[in-house]
C-alpha cells in the first residue's frame, strides 16, 4: 500500500487513509473532524467504490462513471492503482475502457442525452413524476446502448412506453 504515489489532493489522501473502513466510517470520521462538505462527499464516493471490483465491460464502466461527478472516476482509478498495485493491470485496462467511452462521446450524464424534458413535453408527455421516470428509464437504456442516444429513437421509445402504461 503506497499512498505516497497519490497526487497531493486532500480528498485523495483522506480516501486512501479511510479506504478500508467503509463509507459510513469515513463519513463519521470526517464529520467529527469538521471536514468541508465537498471533501467529505468526494471521499465518501471514493471509499464507497474503492472496495468494489470494477469490470472492464463498456456498459459497466459507463454505469460507474455516471454514478459520480466528472473526474472522480479517474481519481478512483488512481486510488486503486496506488493502494492495490496487484490490480494495476486490470485498472489500466479499465482506464483504457473509460478513455474509449469518452472518446466515442458515449452519454454518461442525463444532461447529455439526446432527449430532454422539453422534448418529451413537445411529444405529448405530461410534466410530472411520470416524465422523470421516463427520462430515468431512457437514461438507463442509453447507458447500456449508447448507439441509441438519438432524439427520434428515444422519443419513439418514450411515447410508445407512455401510451402502453
Role assignments for model-derived ranges:
Residues 1-90, 165:
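Conserved, hydrophobic alpha-helical core segments of structured domains
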Residues 83-165:
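Charged substrate- and nucleic-acid-binding regions of tRNA-handling and nucleotidyl-transfer enzymes
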Amino acid at each position: 500500500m503506497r499512498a505516497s504515489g497519490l497526487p497531493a489532493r486532500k480528498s485523495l489522501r483522506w480516501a486512501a487513509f479511510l479506504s478500508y473502513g467503509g463509507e459510513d466510517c469515513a463519513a463519521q470520521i470526517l464529520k467529527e473532524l469538521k471536514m468541508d462538505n465537498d471533501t467529505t462527499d468526494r471521499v465518501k464516493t471514493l471509499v464507497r467504490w474503492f472496495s468494489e471490483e470494477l469490470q472492464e465491460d463498456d456498459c459497466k464502466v459507463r454505469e460507474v462513471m455516471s454514478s459520480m461527478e466528472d473526474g472522480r472516476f479517474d481519481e478512483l482509478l488512481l486510488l486503486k492503482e496506488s493502494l492495490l498495485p496487484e490490480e494495476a493491470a486490470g485498472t489500466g485496462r479499465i482506464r483504457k475502457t473509460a478513455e474509449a467511452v469518452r472518446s466515442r462521446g458515449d452519454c454518461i450524464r442525463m444532461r447529455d442525452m439526446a432527449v430532454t424534458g422539453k422534448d418529451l413535453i413537445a411529444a405529448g408527455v405530461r410534466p410530472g413524476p411520470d416524465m422523470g421516470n421516463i427520462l430515468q428509464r431512457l437514461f438507463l437504456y442509453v447507458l447500456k446502448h449508447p448507439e441509441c442516444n438519438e432524439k427520434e429513437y428515444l422519443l419513439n421509445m418514450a411515447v410508445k412506453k407512455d401510451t402502453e402504461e
